[in-house]
Design a protein with these regions (language model features):
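C-terminal helix-coil-helix/basic helical segment that borders enzyme active sites and/or dimer interfaces
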Residues: 28-37, 271, 275-278, 289-339
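Intrinsic disorder at enzyme termini
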Residues: 1-13, 337-339
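A structural signal for short hydrophobic beta-strand segments in well-ordered beta-sheet cores
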Residues: 142-144
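A short, Trp-centered hydrophobic/proline-enriched beta-strand micro-motif
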Residues: 120-128, 172
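A short core secondary-structure module
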Residues: 149-150, 154-201
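Glycine-rich phosphate/pyrophosphate-binding beta-alpha loops
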Residues: 133-135, 158-163, 206-207
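Glycine-rich beta->alpha junctions and the first turn(s) of the following alpha-helix
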Residues: 3, 198-294, 312
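Internal helix-loop-helix
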Residues: 51-121, 162-168, 288, 302-310, ...
Length: 339
């Protein structure tokens, strides 16, 4: 595997750096750099800018707004976005439901949903997890039973991130409760959030804020033409989605920024002179380089748009390093880290 950028890739990187600096408002980038949570308006504004320049969904098929980029170019696009503190396109739209519709949806569903999904004219949320179906997702119980030209949907979804902003939710539903295997009988259904019978309840944190929700469905009627692909094939589509979701999830660029901030603060307050702290910071910097190389390997193994199962490692290790960076930042900030 080549570990250095080619001259052409370096030029591509520099073009993106210039674009992010000149086209994304500085105040949006500064809020993103310092904020602890997503700003809805900034996400929408940025994604519309990216979409207007053909840069919102490079991982999609070209005919639907994607780019004929190599995996390395796609990784550069994301890394430079993170390093510039640019809000990333909404992952529910760009990495989850969009690729599933593009790969498995009917022509009518593609024409109806893909363009507004790329432009963030539709804000999607994910309806997968249930109270008794989290890590064992195939145990989901929410049913969608065919009744003429509609599905009658009943059940509950939980941990629905940013569902309070969503216009639509893409759900895994059980369309054949009598299927012999729990992975069978599952379908992929698109549901408008303002459909009668849907109730959204926030799951609040101790400070009163929230970003995840419970969603209840009681006799919700969903048009049958909002089924993606074939009935009872939803588990196949879910595996495809989860593979795409993990690509780019390591947040290498943002962790690099956090480590640079830690080094700057530690230099200013003298903590970098502590050999133990300096060694821990150096180890974290080495670990992020190792993760970046793993990310490059995963990207280079994703030719042809096929998700790489090894991307699961990126989610795990990326989260560990984000947590480590936060712990180091709290330590270096001292009393200033208190709310």
């Amino acid at each position: 595997m080549q570990l250095a950028l080619t001259p052409e890739e370096a030029d591509f990187r520099d073009e993106l750096r210039t674009f992010y600096r000149d086209q994304i408002p500085a105040e949006i980038r500064e809020r993103t750099r310092t904020a602890s949570e997503a700003n809805r308006d900034d996400i929408v504004a940025t994604q519309k800018i990216l979409n207007d320049h053909g840069l919102a969904v490079p991982n999609w098929p070209v005919e639907w707004g994607g780019k004929d980029w190599t995996p390395t170019q796609q990784q550069i696009w994301l890394d430079e976005m993170q390093l510039a503190s640019v809000p990333e396109p909404l992952t529910f739209n760009t990495n989850m439901v969009g690729p599933v519709i593009a790969e498995f949806g009917s022509q009518a569903i593609k024409e109806r949903f893909l363009a507004p999904t790329a432009a963030l004219d539709i804000w999607w949320c994910q309806g997968f997890s249930e109270p008794e179906a989290g890590s064992d997702l195939a145990s989901l119980r929410m049913t969608a039973l065919r009744d003429g030209d509609t599905y009658l949907v009943n059940g509950q979804k939980t941990w629905t991130t940013l569902g309070q902003y969503a216009d639509w939710i893409f759900c895994l539903v059980r369309t054949d409760p009598a299927a012999p295997k729990k992975q069978a009988g599952i379908s992929f259904l698109l549901i408008e959030m303002n459909t009668p019978g849907i109730t959204l309840r926030p799951i609040r944190l101790v400070d009163g804020s929230y970003e995840v929700n419970e969603v209840f469905f009681e006799d919700v009627r969903v048009p049958a033409d909002q089924l993606v692909g074939e009935e009872n094939q939803g588990w196949t589509y879910a595996k495809f989605l989860l593979g795409n979701e993990r690509n780019g999830i390591a947040q290498v660029g943002r962790t690099k920024l956090r480590l640079a901030e830690i080094k700057e603060l530690a230099t200013a307050n003298g903590l970098l002179g502590d050999p133990l702290f300096a060694a821990r910071l150096a180890e974290a910097e080495n670990d992020i380089v190792a993760l970046e190389l793993t990310q490059m390997r995963v990207a280079s193994g994703s030719e042809g748009g096929k998700p790489n199962p090894a991307s699961s490692v990126l989610k795990l290790r990326g989260s560990q390093l984000q947590q480590l960076a936060t712990e180091l930042l709290v330590e270096v900030a001292g009393p200033d880290a208190l709310p």
